[in-house]
Amino acid sequence: MYWKSDQMFVCKLEGKEVPELAVPREKCPGLMSEECGRPAALAAGRTRKGAGEEGLVNPEGAGDEDSCSSSAPLSPSSSPQSMASGSVCPPGKCVCSSCGLEIVDKYLLKVNDLCWHVRCLSCSVCRTSLGRHTSCYIKDKDIFCKLDYFRRYGTRCSRCGRHIHSTDWVRRAKGNVYHLACFACFSCKRQLSTGEEFALVEEKVLCRVHFDCMLDNLKREVENGNGISVEGALLTEQDVNHPKPAKRARTSFTADQLQVMQAQFAQDNNPDAQTLQKLAERTGLSRRVIQVWFQNCRARHKKHVSPNHSSSAPVTAVPSSRLSPPMLEEMAYSAYVPQDGTMLTALHSYMDAHQQLLDSSPCYPIQ
């Protein structure tokens, strides 16, 4: 917003001298034709209508009101429609572009070659008075305050969607505008630097590494006959931080390799390092693969070949009432004769000789 230049509003006053501060008299008619026709460049200027004897625009001064004269014939129409279509003010009066009434106030506002009452210039969205604002914006003949203009027509970041202000650092890519911090890889979230290669896929920025990964994913799915979209081929932040473990290829053995290892297993199921090295040289396999094969074979052998255990009947509880005290005749003895068991042999001979006497003796519980 700027004040109109003093020389732009010098009025030719009949019967009065043009002051020394103004331009010469012969230049005044040409300037008068520019008073109502010069664009305001999207800014509102507070103008004193008429300048009295001095003929200068002075928003802070006071004087008699005189109309401006023009050297060129002006349109007699003073309706709001004619003013909105770009016509200049008719001689002798100025019409407000908002209410259509003649402006007889001491001050007026001039925006984009149109005249306004100070009270009539307002935002077309929020209806805020712009009489004391330093600037205003025009779009399709509508007046906006700064806030509403940027809300409706301002540039937004293609990543975060927030407004980009004139003081923000930005990066541009294929017509898209990004905040400096928002110009980062979609997959790894790393901010890209100047001169670094990047790709723009469906409005998403990718660094070179993850762009190649996306192409590999698309190629692999096409080869497998699976349909996949570009969105599905993109790696997300979770996939980057927690990648899925790659499946290990299963090791296959030839008949000759199996024959060599099985022959060694029959001799020694837990070979040492030297034997493993010899087997690796003979079979062409790595020591680690052979060692794992022997571990698996030992586990299978231990599982299928277990020591023989005698089968026993399940033990069941018997009520104590059904139990009877054991009798001597129910007990079977087998004599164990060691090499120096002479005394034990004599004892057993004595017990056999007096068996009848023992059978007739009563049995008493031990107290």
Swiss-Prot record:
Domain annotation LIM zinc-binding: ranges: 96-148, 157-210
Region of interest called Disordered, as start-end residue ranges on this chain: 44-79
SMART domains: HOX (SM00389), LIM (SM00132)
Single biological process term from Gene Ontology: forebrain neuron differentiation
Comp. bias intervals (Low complexity): 68-79
UniProt keyword DNA-binding, yes or no: yes
InterPro entries cross-referenced by the UniProt entry: HD, Homeobox_CS, Homeodomain-like_sf, LIM_Homeobox_TF, Znf_LIM
A cellular component annotation (GO) from this entry: female germ cell nucleus
Residue ranges of the annotated DNA-binding region, renumbered to this chain: 246-305
Compartments (UniProt record): Nucleus
Pfam families: Homeodomain, LIM
Assigned keywords, A-Z: DNA-binding, Homeobox, LIM domain, Metal-binding, Nucleus, Repeat, Transcription, Transcription regulation, Zinc
Molecular-function GO term, any one: DNA binding
Protein role: Transcription factor involved in differentiation of certain neurons and mesenchymal cells.
Protein name, as recorded: LIM/homeobox protein Lhx8
